[in-house]
């Protein structure tokens, strides 16, 4: 019987996840199907329960349900506990396992696809919301020289930094006066077509500016290019986090490069 998987979100029609997982399944010969399900804002838990009762084997979770999925899971992986959010669920005899593959996906895209080593590099993480929290531990595991979290509300960045051990600190945008090797935009500003108030000097020589958003050019990427930085959007992260979820579910690791290339074509 074909195993069922799905991604749950609100909105969800724009999701590329069904296309990505269909490509992974073809590539690896897995008998599975994957769909996008619009969950009501007040009905996420019920939607997941219904899907599992109908034989669903696992699910991805996107905005705005990742924190709710964290609370729903019976068991959590260590990286999900650190992230405080869940983007991958697996249903088994012991209940619901919650995982978070976002940070692993980001690091895989940066170090693998983009060939940007992070060890001994200075990294600036812009934003202090859920998207930022989900990637901090995997970034710190790469042993950067320093990870700086910058946010409009400095206290939020400080509270976030206190949750983790390592070479990291928090500051406001006005305190950014030194160059970085990698600048990651984890804010929702790009969704609104806005630019975080970054000073141009954050982009060091040969710096990479990375926007977690994908699908269109953003003011952040245009600003970074105008100040000499290399740029990348979050499409590779999307595919890499999907590959990590696929591996959790199926025990097979797909080749992401052809899938990323097909989505960019």
From Swiss-Prot:
<dbReference type="Pfam" id="PF18317">
    <property type="entry name" value="SDH_C"/>
</dbReference>
<dbReference type="InterPro" id="IPR011342">
    <property type="entry name" value="Shikimate_DH"/>
</dbReference>
<feature type="binding site">
    <location>
        <position position="234"/>
    </location>
    <ligand>
        <name>NADP(+)</name>
    </ligand>
</feature>
<dbReference type="InterPro" id="IPR006151">
    <property type="entry name" value="Shikm_DH/Glu-tRNA_Rdtase"/>
</dbReference>
<keyword id="KW-0028">Amino-acid biosynthesis</keyword>
<dbReference type="GO" id="GO:0008652">
    <property type="term" value="P:amino acid biosynthetic process"/>
</dbReference>
<dbReference type="InterPro" id="IPR022893">
    <property type="entry name" value="Shikimate_DH_fam"/>
</dbReference>
<dbReference type="InterPro" id="IPR041121">
    <property type="entry name" value="SDH_C"/>
</dbReference>
<comment type="pathway">
    <text>Metabolic intermediate biosynthesis; chorismate biosynthesis; chorismate from D-erythrose 4-phosphate and phosphoenolpyruvate: step 4/7.</text>
</comment>
<comment type="subunit">
    <text>Homodimer.</text>
</comment>
<feature type="binding site">
    <location>
        <position position="102"/>
    </location>
    <ligand>
        <name>shikimate</name>
    </ligand>
</feature>
<protein>
    <recommendedName>
        <fullName>Shikimate dehydrogenase (NADP(+))</fullName>
        <ecNumber>1.1.1.25</ecNumber>
    </recommendedName>
</protein>
<comment type="similarity">
    <text>Belongs to the shikimate dehydrogenase family.</text>
</comment>
<feature type="binding site">
    <location>
        <position position="214"/>
    </location>
    <ligand>
        <name>shikimate</name>
    </ligand>
</feature>
<comment type="function">
    <text>Involved in the biosynthesis of the chorismate, which leads to the biosynthesis of aromatic amino acids. Catalyzes the reversible NADPH linked reduction of 3-dehydroshikimate (DHSA) to yield shikimate (SA).</text>
</comment>
<dbReference type="Pfam" id="PF01488">
    <property type="entry name" value="Shikimate_DH"/>
</dbReference>
<dbReference type="InterPro" id="IPR046346">
    <property type="entry name" value="Aminoacid_DH-like_N_sf"/>
</dbReference>
<feature type="binding site">
    <location>
        <begin position="151"/>
        <end position="156"/>
    </location>
    <ligand>
        <name>NADP(+)</name>
    </ligand>
</feature>
<dbReference type="GO" id="GO:0019632">
    <property type="term" value="P:shikimate metabolic process"/>
</dbReference>
<dbReference type="InterPro" id="IPR036291">
    <property type="entry name" value="NAD(P)-bd_dom_sf"/>
</dbReference>
<feature type="binding site">
    <location>
        <position position="212"/>
    </location>
    <ligand>
        <name>NADP(+)</name>
    </ligand>
</feature>
<dbReference type="GO" id="GO:0004764">
    <property type="term" value="F:shikimate 3-dehydrogenase (NADP+) activity"/>
</dbReference>
<dbReference type="InterPro" id="IPR013708">
    <property type="entry name" value="Shikimate_DH-bd_N"/>
</dbReference>
<keyword id="KW-0560">Oxidoreductase</keyword>
<feature type="binding site">
    <location>
        <begin position="127"/>
        <end position="131"/>
    </location>
    <ligand>
        <name>NADP(+)</name>
    </ligand>
</feature>
<dbReference type="Pfam" id="PF08501">
    <property type="entry name" value="Shikimate_dh_N"/>
</dbReference>
<dbReference type="GO" id="GO:0009423">
    <property type="term" value="P:chorismate biosynthetic process"/>
</dbReference>
<feature type="active site" description="Proton acceptor">
    <location>
        <position position="66"/>
    </location>
</feature>
<dbReference type="GO" id="GO:0009073">
    <property type="term" value="P:aromatic amino acid family biosynthetic process"/>
</dbReference>
<keyword id="KW-0521">NADP</keyword>
<dbReference type="GO" id="GO:0050661">
    <property type="term" value="F:NADP binding"/>
</dbReference>
<feature type="binding site">
    <location>
        <begin position="15"/>
        <end position="17"/>
    </location>
    <ligand>
        <name>shikimate</name>
    </ligand>
</feature>
<feature type="binding site">
    <location>
        <position position="87"/>
    </location>
    <ligand>
        <name>shikimate</name>
    </ligand>
</feature>
<keyword id="KW-0057">Aromatic amino acid biosynthesis</keyword>
<dbReference type="GO" id="GO:0005829">
    <property type="term" value="C:cytosol"/>
</dbReference>
<feature type="binding site">
    <location>
        <position position="62"/>
    </location>
    <ligand>
        <name>shikimate</name>
    </ligand>
</feature>
């Amino acid at each position: 019987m074909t195993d069922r998987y799905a991604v749950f979100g609100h909105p969800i029609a724009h999701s590329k996840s069904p296309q990505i997982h269909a490509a992974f399944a073809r590539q690896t010969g897995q008998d599975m199907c994957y769909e996008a399900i619009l969950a009501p804002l007040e009905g996420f838990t019920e939607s997941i329960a219904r899907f599992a009762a109908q034989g669903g084997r696992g699910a991805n979770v996107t905005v705005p349900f990742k924190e709710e999925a964290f609370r729903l899971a019976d068991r959590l992986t260590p990286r999900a506990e650190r992230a405080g959010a869940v983007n991958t669920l697996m249903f088994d005899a012991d209940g619901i396992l919650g995982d978070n593959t976002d940070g692993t996906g980001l690091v895989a895209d940066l170090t693998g696809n983009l060939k940007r080593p992070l060890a001994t590099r200075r990294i600036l993480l812009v934003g202090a919301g859920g998207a930022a929290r989900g990637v901090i531990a995997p970034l710190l595991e790469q042993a950067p020289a320093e990870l700086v979290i910058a946010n409009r509300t400095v206290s939020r960045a400080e509270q976030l930094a206190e949750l983790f051990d390592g070479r990291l600190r928090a500051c406001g945008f006005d305190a950014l006066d030194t160059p970085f090797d990698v600048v990651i935009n984890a804010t929702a500003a790009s969704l609104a077509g806005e630019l975080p108030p970054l000073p141009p000097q954050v982009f060091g020589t040969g710096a990479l500016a990375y926007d977690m958003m994908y699908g269109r050019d953003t003011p952040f990427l245009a600003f970074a290019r105008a100040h000499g930085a290399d740029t990348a959007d979050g499409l590779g992260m999307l595919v890499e986090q999907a590959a990590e979820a696929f591996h959790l579910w199926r025990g097979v690791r797909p080749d992401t490069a052809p899938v990323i290339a097909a989505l960019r074509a």
